[in-house]
């Protein structure tokens, strides 16, 4: 198990910038607005051959509004989970009441853990002198660092990782987890869905749209299969995306889809499917990811025996050529169909990686050609000789014929639909390639 380092401190002391400095990437959203990192964000890191997990947290606010209190709860959970606590303060704003409160909490309640205290933004000789005042927090060795230029960070990492027991060589996993990106517009219930699955208030949830700004990874096991759930900030219409925070959050959603095997696209049952939902679905399809549509908050819809069938018909008519994507009616609140959603997503992931023998494909081709002969505008006959599957992360099939230019769009769509139906390739993009032979 990799050791977990949690960066904690009051808002706007530079926790996310230090997180990014250590990982050498813009992984957490960094902005001058206090409280921008609202949740816990975990990423793997390595220093001098030693592997670890680094956790960024929302700012610790002893008192505040509902979001601040939720951030406080998440920070306390992070502290309990961590092997090492990195307490960060800001030399430019000086030692504050909140800094002292955090210091007392750590030294009284979590004295059994490895705690390192660092003063950030120490970038000039005068600031180094100012940082000496932080000794009064009670920590014997404050580290003076700058997340912006990297000074002092190497020494801090050396000492933190040297404080841990010698790591055993990391084992290589034979069975990789299935990566599921939970995506959708703001406030459709993505975090509530993840929390209900994990059985803990892992992500900040409130009625305020956009309370989950980062993509957050959570790992769990079901039926001996490991899963990674990637929860993201909801995608908004472009006109509503402000420069800075919302831009990076939308980019995070895009990257989450890029990382996943299956995108769980969630919509609110009360509002139905909208154009923005279709943009998210198309984003996943264009990246050849598996897709499962989740109709959340189904418990809030007045219904009779025909409601679900009528609702599904309306959704599929809106989806057009993507109507092959499976959908489930769920409720994160009542937990209706939550585990069925995970089981279906796993089936889609397996469909996406399925390998079909050439003999089975050509038996299929013979039956398909007997059912529908390809027509052409020129009158010249299109002759498909055989087909095979090409090595790829999703189903890609190669057809060898006399002239690929003769292929009509409707016949291509016929073959695609028949392949998906015959080999039960539910929820996955099927790519067809035609070559002259």
From Swiss-Prot:
What Pfam families does its record include? KH_dom-like, MMR_HSR1
Q: Domain EngA-type G, which positions?
A: 3-168, 178-353
Domain KH-like positions = 354-437
Q: Which PROSITE patterns match?
A: G_ENGA (PS51712)
InterPro entries tied to this protein: G_ENGA, GTP-bd, GTPase_Der, KH_dom-like, KH_dom-like_a/b, P-loop_NTPase, Small_GTP-bd
Q: Which residues bind GTP 1?
A: 9-16, 56-60, 120-123
> Which GO terms fall under biological process for this protein?
ribosome biogenesis
What's one GO MF term for it? GTP binding
Q: Which residues form a coiled coil?
A: none
Does this UniProt record's set of keywords contain Oxidoreductase?
no
- Where does the chain bind GTP 2? 184-191, 231-235, 296-299
Q: Which keywords has UniProt assigned to this entry? A: GTP-binding, Nucleotide-binding, Repeat, Ribosome biogenesis
Name the family: Belongs to the TRAFAC class TrmE-Era-EngA-EngB-Septin-like GTPase superfamily. EngA (Der) GTPase family.
**Subunit comment for this entry?**
Associates with the 50S ribosomal subunit.
Known role:
GTPase that plays an essential role in the late steps of ribosome biogenesis.
Q: What is this protein called?
A: GTPase Der
């Amino acid at each position: 198990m990799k050791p977990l380092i949690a960066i904690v401190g009051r808002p706007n002391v530079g926790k996310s910038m230090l997180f990014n400095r250590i990982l050498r990437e813009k992984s957490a959203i960094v902005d001058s607005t206090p409280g921008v990192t609202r949740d816990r964000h975990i990423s793997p890191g390595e220093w001098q051959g030693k592997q670890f997990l680094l956790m960024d947290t929302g700012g610790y606010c002893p008192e505040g509004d509902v979001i601040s209190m939720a951030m406080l709860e998440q920070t306390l959970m992070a502290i309990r989970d961590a092997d090492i606590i990195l307490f960060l303060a800001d030399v430019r704003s000086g030692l504050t009441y909140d800094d002292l409160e955090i210091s007392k909490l750590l030294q009284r309640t979590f004295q059994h853990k490895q705690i390192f205290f660092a003063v950030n933004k120490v970038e000039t000789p005068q600031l180094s002198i100012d940082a000496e005042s932080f000794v009064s927090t009670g920590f014997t060795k404050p580290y003076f660092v700058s997340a912006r230029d990297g000074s002092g960070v190497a020494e801090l990492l050396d000492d933190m990782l040297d404080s841990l027991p010698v790591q055993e060589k990391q084992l290589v996993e034979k069975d990789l987890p299935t990566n599921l990106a939970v995506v959708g517009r703001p406030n459709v219930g993505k975090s509530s869905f993840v929390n209900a699955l994990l059985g803990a208030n892992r992500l900040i949830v409130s009625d305020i749209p956009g309370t989950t700004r980062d993509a957050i990874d959570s790992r769990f096991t079901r039926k001996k299969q490991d899963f990674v759930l990637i929860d993201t900030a909801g995608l908004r219409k472009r006109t509503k995306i402000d420069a800075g925070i919302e831009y990076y959050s939308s980019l995070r959603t895009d990257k989450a889809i890029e990382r996943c095997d299956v995108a769980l696209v969630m919509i609110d049952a009360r509002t139905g499917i909208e154009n923005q939902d279709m943009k998210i679905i198309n984003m996943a399809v264009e990246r050849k990811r598996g897709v499962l549509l989740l109709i959340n908050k189904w418990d809030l819809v007045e219904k009779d025996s025909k409601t679900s069938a009528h609702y599904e018909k309306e959704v599929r008519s809106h989806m057009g050529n993507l109507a092959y994507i499976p959908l489930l009616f769920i409720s994160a609140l009542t937990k209706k169909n939550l585990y069925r959603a995970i089981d279906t997503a796993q089936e889609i992931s397996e469909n996406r990686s399925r390998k079909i023998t050439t003999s089975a494909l050509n038996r299929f081709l013979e039956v398909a050609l007997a059912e529908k002969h390809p027509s052409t505008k020129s009158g010249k006959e299109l002759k498909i000789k055989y087909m095979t599957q090409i090595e790829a992360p999703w189903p890609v099939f190669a057809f060898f014929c006399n002239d690929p230019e003769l292929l009509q769009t409707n016949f291509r769509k016929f073959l695609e639909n028949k392949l998906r139906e015959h080999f039960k390739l539910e929820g996955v993009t099927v790519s067809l390639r035609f070559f002259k032979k």
